[in-house]
Amino acid sequence: MKAGATSMWASCCGLLNEVMGTGAVRGQQSAFAGATGPFRFTPNPEFSTYPPAATEGPNIVCKACGLSFSVFRKKHVCCDCKKDFCSVCSVLQENLRRCSTCHLLQETAFQRPQLMRLKVKDLRQYLILRNIPIDTCREKEDLVDLVLCHHGLGSEDDMDTSSLNSSRSQTSSFFTRSFFSNYTAPSATMSSFQGELMDGDQTSRSGVPAQVQSEITSANTEDDDDDDDEDDDDEEENAEDRNPGLSKERVRASLSDLSSLDDVEGMSVRQLKEILARNFVNYSGCCEKWELVEKVNRLYKENEENQKSYGERLQLQDEEDDSLCRICMDAVIDCVLLECGHMVTCTKCGKRMSECPICRQYVVRAVHVFKS
């Protein structure tokens, strides 16, 4: 009976060791350390006292913000500096990923005036990403020179590769052209010979005289020429519509072009509509030209009246400004400054003045005056 209880207790302790860890069961064993019999525990060498340390993988972080990559912060490689950046610190441009620093310098086109406007921090970061030492740089100009020097070396390598590719493409195109020209020339002669045979067969089969045939062919060619001219005109109009910058810009009509009401009668319907449209006048219900002329006449008269009233208002405003106090620009000039005698302020401002604002003479007294 005691042996069965001992084996059952040992199996229970093994399960607790697997589930809770060896340390939890060892805490309970300390209470039974002095016990004897089936309650005495023996250490199991298969289980360690402390849990195994987790193996840490390489921690790859963004070069700009220093945050680790995740599902929401994906890793991208900059096409210029070949460093790892997250999606927030990189810019997608023309299917190429660049970091913010490389993109900023790429926007300047590596021109010295544009580079001098950048911050020193951005220039230093650009050089550090390319593992270029900047210990000898003391001024901003040194950083700019270093950037231009490095960019010049990179552009020369690009030019060498591009020139090599272009030379290869030129040689391949030369051989392909020479190869195909040897086979296209006999085929062209054969096609021309077959065309002459077909023309001879058609003329022999048809019993129409040669003069009639020549007249028919000339008429057909004239019709074809007319159709071609019309098609060319349509194509030119479409090209002008698609590329307005290539054609001469037509000057639109406006109210300033009218010197009197008599000029309105000589304008076309298109010009009248342009004038109304530029002045936000609706002409959707107008079906005849005289209706458009009436609207333009009314618009011209209203414009003349507005200009006259605006001129009168400006004149009155100038007169009012001449009579306002030069200090507060609110009250009317009603004060004489003594001893100089200038009238440039109101009574309230004149009493506060210590010297005249015009002649800088000391103000002895400010006298209030009345205008009749």
From Swiss-Prot:
EC category name: transferase
Annotated localization: Cell membrane; Endomembrane system; Nucleus; Nucleus speckle
Keywords carried by this UniProt record: Apoptosis, Cell membrane, Cytoplasm, Membrane, Metal-binding, Nucleus, Phosphoprotein, Repeat, Transferase, Ubl conjugation, Ubl conjugation pathway, Zinc, Zinc-finger
Topology of this chain in the membrane: Peripheral membrane protein
One GO term of the biological process aspect: proteasome-mediated ubiquitin-dependent protein catabolic process
Residue ranges, compositional bias (Basic and acidic residues): 240-252
ZnF locations on chain (FYVE-type): 56-107
Pfam family, one: FYVE_CARP1-2
Example GO molecular function: phosphatidylinositol phosphate binding
PROSITE patterns xrefs: ZF_RING_2 (PS50089)
Compositional bias per record (Polar residues), positions renumbered to this chain: 201-220
Effect recorded for residue 342 to A: Loss of E3 ubiquitin protein ligase activity
Chain residue ranges for the region called Disordered: 194-253
Domain SAP: 115-134, 264-278
Expression by tissue: Ubiquitous. Detected in heart, brain, liver, skeletal muscle, kidney, pancreas, spleen, thymus, prostate, testis, ovary, colon and leukocytes.
InterPro entries (alphabetical): CARP1_2_FYVE, CARP1_FYVE, RING-FYVE_E3_ubiquitin-ligase, RNF34L-like_HeH, SAP_dom_sf, Znf_FYVE_PHD, Znf_RING, Znf_RING/FYVE/PHD
The protein's role, per its UniProt record: E3 ubiquitin-protein ligase that regulates several biological processes through the ubiquitin-mediated proteasomal degradation of various target proteins. Ubiquitinates the caspases CASP8 and CASP10, promoting their proteasomal degradation, to negatively regulate cell death downstream of death domain receptors in the extrinsic pathway of apoptosis. May mediate 'Lys-48'-linked polyubiquitination of RIPK1 and its subsequent proteasomal degradation thereby indirectly regulating the tumor necrosis factor-mediated signaling pathway.
Family annotation (PANTHER family): CASPASE REGULATOR, RING FINGER DOMAIN-CONTAINING (PTHR14879), E3 UBIQUITIN-PROTEIN LIGASE RNF34 (PTHR14879:SF3)
The protein's assembly and partners: Interacts with CASP8 and CASP10. Interacts (via RING-type zinc finger) with PPARGC1A. Interacts with NOD1. Interacts with p53/TP53; involved in p53/TP53 ubiquitination. Interacts (via RING-type zinc finger) with MDM2; the interaction stabilizes MDM2.
Protein name listed in UniProt: E3 ubiquitin-protein ligase RNF34
Organism: Homo sapiens
